[in-house]
Amino acid sequence: MTLQVSPAWASDPGPSNALPGQDTATPVLVEGIREPVDAKAAPADAARQHLAANKSRYRIPRAGSDLVPLAATATGSTDETVRLQQKHRGVPVLGGQYVVRMQKQDGKRVVTGTSGHYFTALSTDVTPQVTEDVAVRRAVAATARRLGAALDKGQAPRSESGDPAATGMTGEAKGLVVLPKGAGVLAYRVTVRGTAPGTGAPVVDEVYVDARSGYPALQYSALKTMAAPAVPAAGEVAESPTADGPPAAPANLVPETGSGARLSGAAASLDIAYDPAAGSYLLADAGRMRSTSKSLLSTWDARGKSVSETSGRWPSGITMFSSPNTTFGAAATDSGAVDAHWNAGQVYDFYKKNLGRDSLDGNGGAVNSLVGVTYYGMPYANAFWDGTKMVYGIGDKEFKPMSADTDVVGHEMTHGVIEHTANLVYAGQSGALNEALADYFGNAIDVTANGTPMGDPTAGLIGEDLCRTKAAADCALRDLNDGATTSKSFLGVSFATDNGGVHLNSTIFSGALWDMREDLGGALADKIVYKAVTEYMTPIDGFTEARGAVLAAAKALGATAGQQNVVKRSFNAHGIVPGWEQALGVDTDTLFGKLNTTDSGVGAGGGWWTASKSNDDGSEPYSVYAGRLDGKGAPKVISPNDGRYHTAPATDGKTVVWTAYGPTSVDVLSRPVAGGPIKTLYSSVTGVAGLRVEKNTVVFEEYDIIGGRHVGYLRPTDKAPVFTDGKKWNTLTALPSISDNKIAYAKLYPEAGSYRLGVEVVDLATGKAVMTEQLDEPVSLGQTGINGKNVFWLSDTDESDGGLTSVISSGLDGRGAFIVSSEHKPGAFVASDLTVSQDALTLVAQTPDTRYRNESLPKLWQLTTDGSRRERVSCNRGEQSYPAAGAGRQVTWLDATTGSTDLVVRERPAGTC
């Protein structure tokens, strides 16, 4: 997020030991001070008094009212750290946290430094114009779009009255927040939970809906996973009821020592408890926190429970692992329970003994681990922290249960530590920092608990002990010694891909920290990183701010000049230096830079492009622009500046059409490229997508209130849209395209007591509709494309192959279907979008891979219409999305390589990369 700078304040640099913030008047880091403050006041009051007394430095005009205490912690006998939450006119500011560090000794207290983000340019009004119900509905719809546009058999309607959970998701409003963009954007925070259509994967999204227009301005997944491997789709499986919290622990537990075998074969001594009432022994450590909070470290039997039942909730009837004696046998070993329990104890001890932290929350809170979790009864090889507990998958043929490796358990539990301290937002650079810190401490705990030397070749590997047959290097999920740097490794992606690169880019930062640990040793390095996380970092820090936090923490801990140089050298070696984002190169021509938009695509036709853009700091609602594909001339504004979000435009070179998000409706608007009046073509209370235009005929799809999708079209003579499916409750149509007065779309329709998928072509001149031939029975259909000769579409006929997709084509009469690219042959794509010209078709596609990396990101591939040739459109390093075909082989798209989203173009494919 970028901020509005205040020129008058920015001209005053402040003290030499203050590091200026980016586009804000408040410094992000102040160190090297010892300024007296009231020793008798509460820590939070003393901290705010210091900020108020130094307005010329901090530029915080109302510290007493605009900064609300979040937490005050003491370290050792003298150090105090206070975290303060910024509020704007009483509304919390996302990422607005400021930290004040103090020392108190001999009846005196001094401030030693500050850090964080306070946004000085906020001026937005905090009165919403959108109702909470509208915000929730649009958040759920936005999440459904994020999860994929394909029309899937799993979306088949069940009843005419509608299923309230037809989308598989529900939203819960969590109140208003201010997004710190420019003058600020007032938004509803909505948490969307449920399961992904088609796959059933767990969904927990945080969606921030603009409270004036109702547009989803920010969105990311809140599930902090160990990795993001592809999982096969599964059929429906009945779930057990769920509860909001864990069952009550038995009373009068007696601490005992037990034993069990780890999955590695090593014997483990286990801290357990005897339950006198049941006469059995539990994997409940009642000893570690017995003298303080009396909380438990508990390991729960979640075998037979699906991941969707455990994400953000507790399966009803779940119990702790138990045994009739102190020896826990094969069931506890094979499920990963022994490993989870032993490893959780190691993590607790590491934080307690080495860093003085009592449990994940720092206050002796309970630690809960669920093991044996499946993917709807199928193997599940992942693990995650859901905000309250650790959840470990049962594994699969190659991967053991995910609790089998100490670094995985350390990683997930460290997410809990971060959530209770820096609380780094799990998206973009701050999310990559979250992952990097979890990896660093996970590995630090692993090598400490298992006695692995730092010089061991496996010391920097994450998850290397999870595999049953693969060697450590081949098994590892990540490698902190992979040499990743910002200049050669940073991958620009949208929040729709890996939450903005939280795993993709994490080893750039974790690698620097690991280098530092190798050179300084664990005793000092771990303290430096921990101090940086708990006392310096704040929720939306990026790599540069985090570098400053680590350097400041090293200095505060008394690191020598030589040791501080080691820290600097470690970051420099990984390219983490101020301004590193400017050093990334591309092989494309930029038509329109730094769009700062979310979930808004691109249109092209007749030699023109159209796209939406916000202002430089992303605070303004989007406007629609149009320009020439040859780059000549300046882009022109097409949409009005009326407070609505103008998004997802399309053009044929004569007319631009787009959607406008307002407080009560989503409107379809149009305007000639040459200028003229803006027309409102249609208003929807639910939502519109997939706009296309040709000679003033517009085609789109509309969502209904129960999650259904219906394709409609408007000809110049039509007073209202004609819906191809009549908006029947039992028929869905989606993903339209238009060419030569014909439209094509995917269709899900009832037949012989079941549902079938097909692609239908309608001749708008005659009204005749034909269903194209199907070469196999698809379970999912993707985007259609049509030109003057053929119709093309994406098809998936095998839901067990990880999303591999075929490209199918047929004649406009529905006959002569053939496979352009097969999902069953080597080199098959995982395709998500398609655009066609007369000469070529271009896909957004991923190639199957076992881990996230540049090669497996969404990239543009261009195929000849007969499939005889396939080439990469661009070798840019980063995500490529929303392609729109120009003439011949020309393509324009949104490219995220540089870390911002740019509209770029190529006249022909790059070929082989």
Where are these regions (language model features)?
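Multi-bladed beta-propeller domains
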Residues: 582-595, 630-643, 673-687, 716-732, ...
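Blade-level signature of beta-propeller repeat domains, shared across WD40, Kelch, NHL, RCC1
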Residues: 868-913
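Extracellular zinc-dependent metalloprotease catalytic-domain scaffold
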Residues: 168-173, 177-181, 189-204, 211, ...
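Segments that shape or occlude catalytic/ligand-binding pockets
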Residues: 7-236, 242, 365-385, 757
